[in-house]
Amino acid sequence: MLLVKNAEIYAPEYLGKKDLLICGGKIECIQDSIRELPVECEVLDAEGKILTPGFLDQHVHITGGGGEGSFHTRTPELQMSELVENGITTVVGLLGTDGITRSVDNLYAKTRVLCEEGVSAYMLTGAYGYPSPTITGETDRDIVFVNEILGVKLALSLIHI
């Protein structure tokens, strides 16, 4: 258990200066003051600190991005520290323009790594190009059978004749 004392809490509306009790990784209660607990727990004084829900980033190139301008334009894969520093607790990863040197298998592996590190991580199957790269061989099967896959990444281009 963790007791956070004296935090300015937004959930997401402003609740004021409160104490917050976390049990088993979940918020148990938020009160003006929590004084007596049935068991010992870690206490964190958050005086002068702001406590907010974690942010969700629904478009993240967790295995890196870029690449459309040649190899030197590729960006590195995301590190857990980048999420923590920005208050992001939930991500949805996708490939983007580079479905050749990056793969949905690698994207799935990175999604699982982030989950194991404590982030709520999901992904979109597919990438630019047709047919769309998948894990199971079909986008609908990816969505149905792989829990971390929420949908498919599509990119459409218009050609004027």
Label each residue range with its predicted role.
Residues 159-161:
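Conserved small/polar residues in nucleotide/adenosyl-binding loops
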Residues 132-141:
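Distinct, well-ordered alpha-helical segments
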Residues 140-148:
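Acidic (Asp/Glu)-rich catalytic clusters
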Residues 96, 103-119, 123-131:
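A metal-dependent hydrolase metal-coordination microenvironment
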Residues 56-58, 91, 121-124, 150-156:
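Hydrophobic faces of well-ordered beta-strands that scaffold small-molecule active sites
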Residues 61-63, 67, 96, 126-130, ...:
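Active-site beta-loop-alpha junctions enriched in small/polar residues
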Residues 46-109:
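Metal-associated gating/positioning segment near the N- to mid-region
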Residues 1-2, 9-52:
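Histidine-rich, glycine-flanked metal-binding segment
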